[in-house]
């Protein structure tokens, strides 16, 4: 997972690495700069680690990538990778689509807006969600001890 792929891992919501995955920013060893991905790498792992990887053109294994926060989980085998992926996708299906999108949008606003305005906006979004169709369905499903409609019948 080099260059642009490394950048994609840094902007992903959930990243799972296989047992043989290698990550790196080889651009400087190729005579170019990691212009498009550098801001995302810094945001994901911090300036000092991004400098170390980029300025030395380092390649790291999946465990180091997990330690740095580039990926969230590592698999010891290809079979475990498939299991972790299936589990993550199953968890996604258990979450309401609109609530998930609104949550992601809220999280991306943190650090870019004043906290007071962000909290006010979040409270408004929460109230809308409670009154909305997903909030109603989720509450009813919980009370009736069943899966919400968006979760499907596959499990």
Residue ranges of each PLM-predicted region?
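Glycine-rich beta-to-alpha active-site loop
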Residues: 1-30, 59-62
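Functionally critical, cavity-lining and gating residues within the transmembrane helices
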Residues: 2, 34, 47, 135
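C-terminal long alpha-helix characteristic of the crotonase
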Residues: 16-21, 71-120, 124, 149-155
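Hydrophobic, secondary-structure "cap" segments at the distal end of domains
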Residues: 39-48
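Conserved catalytic core of Hanks-type protein kinase domains
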Residues: 44, 56, 129
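Short helix- or helix-capping micro-motifs
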Residues: 49-58
């Amino acid at each position: 997972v080099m260059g642009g792929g490394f950048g994609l891992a840094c902007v992903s919501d959930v990243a799972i690495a296989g047992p043989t995955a290698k990550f790196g920013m080889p651009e400087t060893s190729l005579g170019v700069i990691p212009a498009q991905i550098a801001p995302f790498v810094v945001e994901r792992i911090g300036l000092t680690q991004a400098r170390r990887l980029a300025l030395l053109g380092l390649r790291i294994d999946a465990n180091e990538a997990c330690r740095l926060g580039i990926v969230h989980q590592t698999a010891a085998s290809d079979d475990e990778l498939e299991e972790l992926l299936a589990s993550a996708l199953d968890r996604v299906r258990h979450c309401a689509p609109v609530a998930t999108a609104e949550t992601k949008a809220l999280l991306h606003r943190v650090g870019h807006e004043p906290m007071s305005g962000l909290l006010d906006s979040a409270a408004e979004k929460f109230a809308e969600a409670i009154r909305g169709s997903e909030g109603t369905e989720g509450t009813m499903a919980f009370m009736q001890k069943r899966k919400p409609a968006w979760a499907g019948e596959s499990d």
